[in-house]
A protein has these predicted regions:
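Sec/Tat signal peptide C-region and signal peptidase I cleavage site
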Residues: 15-19
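Buried hydrophobic residues that stabilize the cores of well-folded domains
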Residues: 20-142
Length: 142
């Protein structure tokens, strides 16, 4: 009986971990991006001065945690990505917070995944927490 309980607990924990897992290629990319800040520069045709177009910040696991898009006047928008507490390199984003050019929250997105780790729902909320819309993902085999 004790072995059965241990087996059930192991299987349950495995499904929780597996649901958040990402592909091997994603893990390799994340390993190469640990603690990185990626800056994208844009140079208009006929101009020699480049301007910062986008900045992406990665955490110690190589997961994207912030992305900022710039315009000539400064920040256009910013998105902060959140992962489950105490998660590791294999975790998928569970929440995004989008800010406008004045750094005010304009939208919050929450994500749900199935046991295979595929995204199944995206819940979009207004800044006040009221549900705006729900996007459902359907995977149709060939």
């Amino acid at each position: 009986m004790k072995k059965l309980l241990i087996l059930v607990a192991f299987v349950a924990l495995s499904f929780g971990t597996f649901a958040q897992s990402v592909s091997e290629s994603t893990i390799t990319k994340r390993e190469n991006r640990r603690g990185m800040v990626l800056k994208e520069w844009n140079t208009p045709a006929g101009d020699k001065r480049a301007f910062l177009d986008r900045k992406t910040t990665y955490d110690e696991f190589g997961r994207k945690i912030e992305e900022i898009e710039y315009a000539s006047y400064g920040q256009k928008w910013r998105v902060v990505y959140e992962y489950p507490a105490n998660s590791d390199i294999t975790a998928k984003v569970v929440r995004e917070i989008e800010y406008n050019d004045r750094d005010k929250v304009v939208r919050i997105r929450k994500y749900e995944y199935d046991e295979d780790g595929s995204k199944v729902r995206q819940l979009n909320y207004y800044p006040n927490g009221k549900l705006e819309s729900v996007k459902t993902f359907e995977y149709v085999p060939k």
